[in-house]
């Protein structure tokens, strides 16, 4: 019923009437053809019952706002009919509404926003494409940055690997007094052996006195360019060495 009503309203709105003066210059060339077309259209739609349409605002409520059909026709034209230049004006005069674009026709009960959504789809697609391109550019920048970092790390690792064998060679050197029999790195400081002059002076001082006072220790350290701690440790080691020698010496019968 809604389809028949729509067609009847559609036909009534586009059938030319007697008092339509604006159609006179359009079809002034064939008055006989106009009369025949009016009779045909009246006979075709006379059997259908008239149907009254309500306003869009009363059906859908106050939330629906009327849309201008002219703006809709400007926004998107899915179908445009190009009339033939054969000179035959019968088809054009019988049904002139067939030449108008589809969005310009006032269909009540149908939303006119569908073509606007269709028009916005390419814009949304283009926006998504731009975001994809931006992401691709960002990933390309990240890959180039990582590719730049990898050679630098490789060069630094290569230089570090070159330094490690040199250090191991120094540790494995038998002439190095800091290396022990396991050839392992020691967390302790390297030994600072005493010079022959320092050793000789310390031996002389030890022969005179096995224990040094604080003042004498300070004087010996200042003369031999040593610290008080070094002088103290040397005297401790020398006393332990003397005790060991006395223990290993055979006792007299």
UniProtKB/Swiss-Prot annotation:
Protein name: Homeobox protein Hox-A9b
InterPro entries cross-referenced by the UniProt entry: Abd-B_homeobox_TF (IPR050803), HD (IPR001356), HD_metazoa (IPR020479), Homeobox_CS (IPR017970), Homeodomain-like_sf (IPR009057), Hox9_activation_N (IPR006711), HXA9/HXB9/HXC9 (IPR017112)
GO CC term, one of those recorded: nucleus
Subcellular location field: Nucleus
Task of the protein: Sequence-specific transcription factor which is part of a developmental regulatory system that provides cells with specific positional identities on the anterior-posterior axis.
Gene Ontology terms describing biological process: anterior/posterior pattern specification; DNA-templated transcription; embryonic skeletal system morphogenesis; proximal/distal pattern formation; regulation of transcription by RNA polymerase II
Region (Disordered): 142-188
Superkingdom of source: Eukaryota
Pfam families membership: Homeodomain (PF00046), Hox9_act (PF04617)
Keywords: Developmental protein, DNA-binding, Homeobox, Nucleus, Transcription, Transcription regulation
Annotation: DNA-binding region: 187-246
CDD domains attached to this UniProt entry: homeodomain
Family classification: Belongs to the Abd-B homeobox family.
Alphabetized GO MF terms: DNA-binding transcription factor activity; DNA-binding transcription factor activity, RNA polymerase II-specific; RNA polymerase II cis-regulatory region sequence-specific DNA binding
Start-end of Basic and acidic residues biased regions: 159-172
Native organism: Danio rerio
């Amino acid at each position: 019923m809604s389809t028949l009503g729509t067609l009847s309203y559609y036909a009534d709105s586009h059938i030319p009437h007697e008092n339509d003066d604006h159609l006179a210059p359009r079809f002034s060339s064939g008055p006989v053809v106009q009369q025949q077309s009016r009779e045909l259209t009246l006979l075709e739609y006379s059997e259908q019952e008239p149907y009254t349409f309500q306003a869009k605002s009363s059906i859908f409520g106050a939330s629906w706002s009327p849309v201008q059909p002219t703006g809709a026709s400007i926004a998107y034209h899915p179908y445009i009919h190009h009339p033939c230049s054969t000179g035959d004006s019968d088809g054009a005069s019988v049904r002139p509404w067939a030449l108008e674009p589809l969005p310009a026709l006032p269909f009540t009960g149908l939303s006119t926003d569908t073509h606007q959504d269709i028009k916005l789809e390419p814009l949304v697609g283009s926006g998504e494409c731009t975001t994809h391109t931006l992401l691709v550019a960002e990933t390309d920048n990240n890959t180039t940055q990582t590719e730049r970092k990898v050679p630098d790390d490789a060069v630094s690792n290569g230089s570090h690997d070159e330094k490690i064998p040199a250090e191991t060679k120094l540790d494995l050197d038998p002439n190095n007094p800091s290396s022990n029999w396991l050839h392992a790195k020691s967390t302790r400081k390297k030994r600072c052996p005493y010079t022959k002059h320092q050793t000789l002076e310390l031996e002389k001082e030890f022969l005179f006195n096995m224990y040094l006072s604080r003042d004498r220790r300070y004087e010996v350290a200042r003369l031999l360019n040593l610290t008080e701690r070094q002088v103290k440790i040397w005297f401790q080691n020398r006393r332990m060495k003397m005790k060991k020698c006395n223990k290993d010496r055979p006792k007299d019968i």
